[in-house]
UniProtKB/Swiss-Prot annotation:
<protein>
    <recommendedName>
        <fullName>Protein RDR1</fullName>
    </recommendedName>
</protein>
<dbReference type="GO" id="GO:0008270">
    <property type="term" value="F:zinc ion binding"/>
</dbReference>
<dbReference type="GO" id="GO:0003700">
    <property type="term" value="F:DNA-binding transcription factor activity"/>
</dbReference>
<keyword id="KW-0539">Nucleus</keyword>
<dbReference type="GO" id="GO:0009410">
    <property type="term" value="P:response to xenobiotic stimulus"/>
</dbReference>
<dbReference type="GO" id="GO:0006351">
    <property type="term" value="P:DNA-templated transcription"/>
</dbReference>
<keyword id="KW-0804">Transcription</keyword>
<dbReference type="InterPro" id="IPR036864">
    <property type="entry name" value="Zn2-C6_fun-type_DNA-bd_sf"/>
</dbReference>
<keyword id="KW-0862">Zinc</keyword>
<dbReference type="InterPro" id="IPR001138">
    <property type="entry name" value="Zn2Cys6_DnaBD"/>
</dbReference>
<keyword id="KW-0805">Transcription regulation</keyword>
<dbReference type="GO" id="GO:0000981">
    <property type="term" value="F:DNA-binding transcription factor activity, RNA polymerase II-specific"/>
</dbReference>
<dbReference type="Pfam" id="PF04082">
    <property type="entry name" value="Fungal_trans"/>
</dbReference>
<dbReference type="GO" id="GO:0043565">
    <property type="term" value="F:sequence-specific DNA binding"/>
</dbReference>
<keyword id="KW-0238">DNA-binding</keyword>
<feature type="DNA-binding region" description="Zn(2)-C6 fungal-type">
    <location>
        <begin position="20"/>
        <end position="46"/>
    </location>
</feature>
<keyword id="KW-0479">Metal-binding</keyword>
Length: 546
């Protein structure tokens, strides 16, 4: 029945004048476009009886084509190649489209062995095409791993303790690494402590929040923090959950990566960050799920609201930023995805995730073959980026020092202005490190950035850099005394050793210069001793020379 307000425009059934051949054969609704939505979704070759073939339609955006959204981005996303002219959609483009199965959070591409049987069934016009499944992936001789047994998180920490510790997490970690939806977390916490089995996987996220919150409480942290960390690890390693990756797993892996970066060896943290990116790709977080170049398996519409989409973007870009920055600092390869269509995160008050992502994008994409000009350009961009948060100032320091180390390997002679940029970034990072450590916020780079800055000042070895060594060493000493850990004292001892070696080297250089001065003095003395002063000063003796 038409509403009263619709009398002026009576509702009429809209019909398409001509349907494409694939839709006519399958008796499916066609919107008459070229290509139509149905062919785009199922990967059919859209064509019409009148001979029309798919052409570049404004309704279909190919990966690589610019859009108003991409034009307004503050940075260029890596892996996206923009073309100025839209290209016609051909069969090759269609068959290279991606497939997302929302029922299992599974992402793949049509030339994958997992997707090919279904694509073939659709091409053969099967009434019941094969599902998106890894048919014949192995011989099936052995069963899959059995699930692991887990203690209850509620046996390790009470709900009251969770709420107390989570306040620290949301005040310290969440503003920078926005990987947890607070509203969704609050709902799942209540369900988890009520014994809902379905939220067991989400227990890894809850445990990750507790672990990081406890870590940043310092000496007031939870006494069973390590048990909570192991609980989260056990959930993530459980084959029951790892068989089907989810957004919750990615969130939990990001939290675990942050914790490992703050507490464990670099290789372990780097490995966890790589796993996080691979899981993100497995569920298609690096793509916009509503893009028309992504076919939806089983014609199930994606269940992503605007809020959910923004959360998944923040989650993906946080994971990508951690892997990119950590890999660049550690000197390992970051995970490179074939292409990324995920939109950038929006800036919000009190949230610095967008700033972190922007910093990560300043790192040269080809970190191995970047030349001096590219490194200097990146360094200048890092210097110009805002110091919106003390942790971001430290991150700027990490990237800056990483860029310098690569410039040093290229034997590039730094201009005085470049040295001043490094010193400015380093001094700001020093102040941020000392401020954070006094707040008991022991981010990993309060120590590492301070230590590396001392090393870089000694390596630059110019009057401008050496004039800041004393202040940097004093700050490192103060941070070491506050932390009071073995690793802090080890870094302090190493920095002092390098300083002493630098002084020793300069003393040797001075001695070498002094030797040249002594040789000159000895030479002059030798020449003076060869003169017969008595004969020279005796007037009578001068007659012999006349």
């Amino acid at each position: 029945m038409a509403s009263p307000g619709s009398t002026a425009l009576p509702h009429k059934r809209q019909r398409v004048r001509k349907a494409c051949v694939p839709c006519r054969e399958r008796k499916r609704k066609c919107n008459g476009k070229s290509p139509c939505e149905m062919c785009v979704a199922y990967g059919y070759v859209c064509h019409y009886i009148d001979g029309r073939v798919p052409s570049a339609s404004p309704q279909v955006q190919q990966v690589g084509e610019t859009s108003p959204d991409t034009e307004s981005r503050p940075f260029v996303l890596p892996g996206i190649h923009r073309n100025e002219q839209p290209q016609p959609i051909n069969t090759q483009n269609v068959t290279s489209q991606n497939i997302v199965d929302p029922t299992k959070s599974r992402y793949t591409i049509q030339h994958s062995a997992v997707a090919f049987p279904r694509c073939l069934g659709l091409e053969l016009r099967s009434t019941n095409p094969p599902r998106l499944h890894s048919f014949a992936w192995h011989c099936g001789i052995r069963p899959e791993e059995n699930p692991n047994s887990h203690v209850l998180l509620s046996d390790l920490v009470t709900k009251e303790e969770y709420y107390r510790i989570s306040k620290v997490y949301f005040s310290v970690v969440h503003p920078i690494f926005d990987v947890v939806n607070p509203e969704q977390l609050a709902k799942n916490v209540e369900k988890y402590w009520d014994g809902d089995v379905k939220t067991l996987e989400y227990g890894a996220v809850i445990a990750g929040v507790i672990a990081l919150g406890s870590f940043f409480m310092g000496s007031l942290g939870h006494p069973r923090e390590m048990d909570i960390v192991q609980y989260a690890k056990g959930i993530l390693d459980d084959p029951t959950f790892s068989r089907i990756p989810t957004v919750e797993q990615v969130s939990a892996w990001v939290l675990r990566t942050i914790y490992l970066r703050a507490t464990s060896r670099p290789h372990v943290a780097w490995l966890a960050s790589c796993v996080t990116i691979h899981l993100s790709e497995a569920i298609g977080l690096h793509h916009e799920i509503d893009r028309e170049d992504i076919a939806i398996s089983n014609n199930v519409p994606p269940k992503r609201t605007t809020v959910v989409s923004e959360h998944t973007r923040r989650l993906f870009w946080c994971a990508w930023s951690i892997n990119t920055i950590l890999s660049y600092d550690y000197g390992r390869s970051s995970v490179t995805l074939n292409r990324i269509t995920c939109k950038p995160v929006k800036e919000t008050d009190g949230n610095f995730t967008a700033h972190l992502v922007a910093l990560a994008h300043l790192i040269p994409q080809d970190s191995v073959n970047a030349n001096a000009a590219q490194l200097l350009q990146a360094l200048a961009a890092v210097h110009e980026s805002p110091n919106a948060h003390p942790f971001l100032s430290l991150t700027k320091g990490d990237i800056c020092l990483s860029l310098y180390r690569r410039l040093r390997l290229l034997n590039h002679i730094l201009d005085k202005n470049v040295v001043l940029q490094i010193i400015d970034i380093g001094n700001t990072a020093l102040s941020a490190a000392y401020a954070l450590v006094k707040l008991d916020q022991a981010w990993w780079n309060v120590l590492s950035t301070s230590f590396q800055y001392v090393c870089v000042l000694l390596a630059i070895d110019t009057p401008e850099s050496l004039s800041h060594v004393a202040t940097a060493m004093k700050t490192l000493d103060n941070i070491t005394q506050i932390l009071g850990t073995r690793i802090a004292f080890e870094a302090q001892k190493t920095a002092k050793l390098l300083l002493e070696d630098s002084m020793k080297k300069k003393r040797q250089e001075i001695q070498q210069l002094e030797q040249a001065t002594h040789q000159r003095s000895n030479l002059e003395t030798t020449h003076l001793l060869d003169i017969d002063w008595d004969a020279l000063l005796d007037p009578s003796d001068t007659l012999n020379f006349m």
